[in-house]
Amino acid sequence: MDFNLITTDKDSRARAGLIKTDHGEIETPIFMPVGTAGTVKGVHQRELEDDIQAQIILGNTYHLYLRPGLDILEKAGGLHKFNGWRKPILTDSGGYQVYSLSERRKIIEKGVEFKSHIDGSKHFFTPEYAMDVQRVIGADIIMAFDECTPYPCEYGYAKRSMEMTHRWLKRCCNRFDETESKYGYNQTLFPIVQGSVYDDLREKSAEFIASMDREGNAIGGLSVGEPAEDMYKHTDIVTRILPADKPRYLMGVGTPINILETIALGIDMFDCVMPTRNARNGMLFTSEGFINIKNKKWEADFSPIDPNGTSYVDSFYSKAYLRHLTISKEILGAQIASIHNLSFYIWLVKEARKHIIAGDFHPWKTEMVRKMATRL
């Protein structure tokens, strides 16, 4: 993987860059649609590529490991061939599931024992095995195995967890470096900064991650319930330490406002289930603000979903029709809303990049944040 930093905004730390992988190029800032089990819910690959214009998607190691399983994925030739996605893929390591499956797992120095949410069967992930699993899945960018601490989190626990994550990272790097890609193309390993909401821990973790000198870096353990101000504060702390010549990935973030504010702090990559999850509940992000399509005010509104939208569904379908589908619980309603929301997120980061390059990102961002806070 190569990263070319094209320019930095004169009034903030926002950056425009280009990531090159063996499955194609990624213009940054970038939003990555989440395909947890190998699919972005309700969206065909052709729609993702041609209509939404996604440049990279995300898969979930924990879910793919359990189903369809490594045997099927390896026989298929990796996730790209299994799901037909021709562009880059990023996989997380399962560390977030360590956090989210708190009732089903046990953490020790060696690794994590957890019970499957599908059938209750027991499994054990070590940092080394997390690398092996991601070699089989075959994503272009893979993540180190870490523990994502909850919020709130007591200082002592956050410190011990961070230090263990650092030890796990060394084991991940050793395993990654002694193995090769199974499918003939390059893979890249990103370490993850942790430290909860403690300034000194975030600084220490960022310094350690930077010292590992990998090709890109991630920030984890944010957007887990802490106030947005804490998210921005600790993103700011970390991005001032991580090297500028490598991409920075803020994991699991977030709302359009979160994305805009952290682009301004120097973040390059984002993922979040929000656009598709909200879509399935009738919540739409538009260029003028936020819409609950189930509200009665849209019942006879025959205007396009978003006249400024970039996807086919934005101009072809009306708000009234989408409301009808959503209220009726028709599958098509969730599909249309998902395509719209994902297209909006991709449009948002593309516009951010355009304005960073043009030199007017700050005033554009200020106006967009105002619009994104508006409920229509």
Please report, for each region that a protein language model flagged, where it lies by residue:
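Short, well-ordered coil/turn segments that N-cap beta-strands
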Residues: 53-55, 85-89, 138-141, 184-189, ...
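Non-catalytic, usually N-terminal nucleic-acid engagement modules in DNA/RNA processing proteins
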Residues: 1-182, 296-299
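Conserved, mostly hydrophobic/aromatic
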Residues: 24, 57, 92, 134, ...
